[in-house]
């Protein structure tokens, strides 16, 4: 291979490698999950080490705790061992929460997909949470004699984590900012509650984004964030979408 050819590739790595991971819960318990790993290296012209072999050696250390200092220490070690310019790691996995129905208080498991990512040269870990919520259209409510169209929506909340943040607290921040929450177990009294709760709290997707942004901006442990909300419209062919990034706000 010529020297010119050796400089064409900018990044190399592995993707979709499944590994066991342990997540801490707010109640002090540990939750075992399976994470899909992606790790990429921004390469120089030549490599000193074997990327796949080094990944397999170091990955078990990443699964023990998701904590900024330990992750960045391991990433720097990885970077030096294989002689690359930059390393980026992401782990994606489901996180389960036992959630009570609002009236019957019956419990069911809610699944929240999350991704943790970090790079050498950066100080924090970025946590991305995918949270289902309910939106109810304010316009539909205003023009109708009875009822209003409502639907499930997905909020994607990305937070730069320089100090530890409980996933449950981030999920709660998002869920409390929508027309109503989503539950896995609902009896008839619960369905009545969530229907009326959404009707009394109509929101466009941009309203949800704004409310999350204000609450995130006031949180002492959140330094940077972005939020997107996509509503899977029940009566329209299209979906509704809104997005905001804290870098563009004066909060």
Swiss-Prot record:
Family: Belongs to the GTP cyclohydrolase IV family.
Top EC class for this record: hydrolase
GO molecular function (one): GTP cyclohydrolase I activity
Record-linked InterPro entries: GTP_cyclohydrolase_FolE2, GTP_cyclohydrolase_FolE2/MptA
E.C. number: 3.5.4.16
Catalysed reactions, semicolon-separated: GTP + H2O = 7,8-dihydroneopterin 3'-triphosphate + formate + H(+)
Protein name (Swiss-Prot/TrEMBL): GTP cyclohydrolase FolE2
Pathway: Cofactor biosynthesis; 7,8-dihydroneopterin triphosphate biosynthesis; 7,8-dihydroneopterin triphosphate from GTP: step 1/1
Phylogenetic classification of the source organism: Bacteria, Pseudomonadati, Thermodesulfobacteriota, Desulfobulbia, Desulfobulbales
Function of the molecule: Converts GTP to 7,8-dihydroneopterin triphosphate.
Cell inner membrane in keyword set: no
């Amino acid at each position: 291979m010529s020297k010119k050819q050796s400089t064409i590739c900018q990044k190399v790595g592995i993707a979709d490698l499944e590994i066991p991971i342990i997540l801490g819960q707010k109640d002090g318990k540990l939750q075992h999950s399976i994470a899909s790993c992606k790790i990429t290296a921004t390469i120089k012209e030549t490599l000193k080490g074997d990327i796949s072999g080094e990944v397999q050696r170091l990955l078990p250390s990443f699964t023990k705790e998701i904590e900024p200092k330990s992750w960045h220490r391991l990433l720097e070690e990885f970077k030096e061992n294989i002689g690359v310019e930059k390393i980026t790691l992401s782990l994606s996995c489901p996180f389960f929460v036992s959630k009570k129905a609002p009236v019957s208080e019956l419990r069911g498991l809610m699944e929240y997909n999350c991704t943790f990512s970090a790079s050498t040269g950066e100080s924090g870990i970025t946590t991305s949470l995918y949270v289902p919520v309910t939106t109810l259209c304010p316009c539909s409510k205003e023009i109708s004699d009875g009822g209003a169209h409502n639907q499930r929506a997905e909020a994607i909340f990305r937070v730069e984590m320089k100090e530890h943040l409980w996933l449950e607290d981030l999920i709660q921040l998002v869920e409390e900012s929508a027309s109503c929450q989503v539950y896995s177990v609902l009896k008839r009294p619960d369905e009545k509650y969530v229907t009326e709760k959404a009707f009394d709290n109509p929101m466009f997707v941009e309203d949800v984004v704004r409310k999350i942004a204000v609450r995130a901006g006031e949180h002492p442990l959140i330094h940077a964030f972005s939020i997107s909300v996509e509503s899977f419209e029940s009566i329209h062919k299209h979906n509704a979408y809104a997005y905001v990034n804290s870098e563009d706000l004066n909060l």
